[in-house]
């Protein structure tokens, strides 16, 4: 079970509408239809004209538009360590898991994601095999 590290206080109440993900290019755009109810306002990089753009450009777009970046790519995890939030990053440590498995993970962990969003000092949430945040 993932957790948000260093959370001694109760997290602020975060509503469903507050959590919007920017899905990295390594995730299927079809994922959006499976998570829409839990993450309204989420987008895939293709939808916002960022397909093929650099990680730096995607990072800046997410920062300016209040998105949490969701990715299986290690590069955004590393950027999180280097630059900190915003934006926040959800690193999906799921190997070659398919769209359905990733959708299930994200929907089952929606409360964890909300708690993560409520902690301004937290920049990285790892969901999947390792199940922790930094």
Residue ranges and their predicted role:
Residues 1-19, 133-134:
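Intrinsically disordered, low-complexity and often Lys/Arg-enriched segments
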Residues 20-68:
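N-terminal first-folded block
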Residues 23-24, 71-72, 94:
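Small/polar loops that bind or transfer phosphate-bearing groups
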Residues 29, 76-78, 133:
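Glycine-rich nucleotide phosphate-binding loop and flanking beta-alpha elements
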Residues 63-80:
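Acidic, metal-binding active-site segment of PIN/NYN-like and related structure-specific nucleases
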Residues 79-88:
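Ligand-binding "clamshell"
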Residues 87-133:
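C-terminal structural segments of small proteins and small subunits
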